[in-house]
Amino acid sequence: MGSNDYYDLLGVSRGASEEEIKKSYRKKVFEYHPDRNPGNKEAEEKFKKISEAYDVLTDSDKRAAYDRYGHSAFANGMGGNQGFTGGFDGGFSTDFSDIFNDFFGGGFGKTSRQSSRENMRGSDLRYDIEVTLEDAFKGVKVPISYVTHVQCSHCSGSGGEGTAKSVKCGTCNGAGRIRTRKGFLTIEELCHTCSGEGEVVKNKCKRCAGSGRVRNEVGILVTVPRGIENGNKVRVNGKGEAGYRGARSGDLYVYVVVKDHKFFTRRGMDLYCNVPIKMTLAALGGEIEMPSIDGTWTKLKIPEGTQSNDKLRMRGKGMPDIQGGERRGDMYVQVTVETPVKLTKKQEELLKQFEDESNANSSPKFSGFFQKIKGIWKDISS
């Protein structure tokens, strides 16, 4: 079983803070908890030792005693008057409520049977899917299949064969919890025979061996809502792992990956795209037909004098709000003014004529730039 040193059991240094001890304990107790390792005696023993270590190291007096005397501090009911003070009462039990709340979402202040039913709940599952941007725009139903534990159809989840009835657990005498004492340290935990139920099935189901669940393939349709974003998850209640002996099933979390689009880039509810336009259209203005994510085509007005990298806004042509309603984001079109190539002689003549008749007002940025450069060189040379 390895070292019995309390610090080694929890995987922390001797100078570890209480918060570090608690954090490490959470991981260890989750890993070795008997409910997650049914029938594993080694895990059960490890769980007991880890719990004992946690109880000692999170109590300042007990920890001081352990640091000074080691395990002998707790042998044979040694009290506070033997080598140290601390006012021990000779019998105490570990309080797991703050730890198990983190794992099982319930209060250990509830009855043993209530808390045990929560601990027998099936695990949540994760499934990843890919959808297109068009799917994310309109919403889509995606068929998926996966293998998990489902309720045993032979016993309907009861874990019993036929009309078998439950009887009082002989290990805990129906209490659902057992106490283990070592020295004056008393640890209370769920009964591993009945998993805290206080009852056991007399004749176990032959198909599921009394667990009330079997592994099988599940097929469902996942509804992906309109406006879903990359990385969002969809929760499907009760479609996770089936619980033990009729306990509540876990949930299925479907994580959505929205594939990159060839034309649009998405930022929140807004869409962005790049479009080349002719030099003449940029200079004179006009209209072009633009595709929208909803599959329609819409006219976009190009203002006179449009420059490369100008962004033109098309209101309400973006993605829908995932919260519902008719609100949509916008579409931003960034234009690139294309310079003509492979000109005919007539086109060259017309462009030369255009150049001859151009003035500073026709290309203000161009003229202003070179005027500025000339001014810089003049200042340097003077």
UniProtKB/Swiss-Prot annotation:
* Record bears the keyword Metal-binding: yes
Subcellular location per UniProt equals: Cytoplasm
Chief subcellular location equals cytoplasm
| Domain comment, as recorded | The J domain is necessary and sufficient to stimulate DnaK ATPase activity. Zinc center 1 plays an important role in the autonomous, DnaK-independent chaperone activity of DnaJ. Zinc center 2 is essential for interaction with DnaK and for DnaJ activity.
Cited NCBIfam families: DnaJ_bact, PRK10767.1
Function recorded in the entry: Participates actively in the response to hyperosmotic and heat shock by preventing the aggregation of stress-denatured proteins and by disaggregating proteins, also in an autonomous, DnaK-independent fashion. Unfolded proteins bind initially to DnaJ; upon interaction with the DnaJ-bound protein, DnaK hydrolyzes its bound ATP, resulting in the formation of a stable complex. GrpE releases ADP from DnaK; ATP binding to DnaK triggers the release of the substrate protein, thus completing the reaction cycle.
The entry's protein name is Chaperone protein DnaJ
Name the source organism: Anaplasma phagocytophilum (strain HZ)
Lineage at the top is: Bacteria, Pseudomonadati, Pseudomonadota, Alphaproteobacteria, Rickettsiales
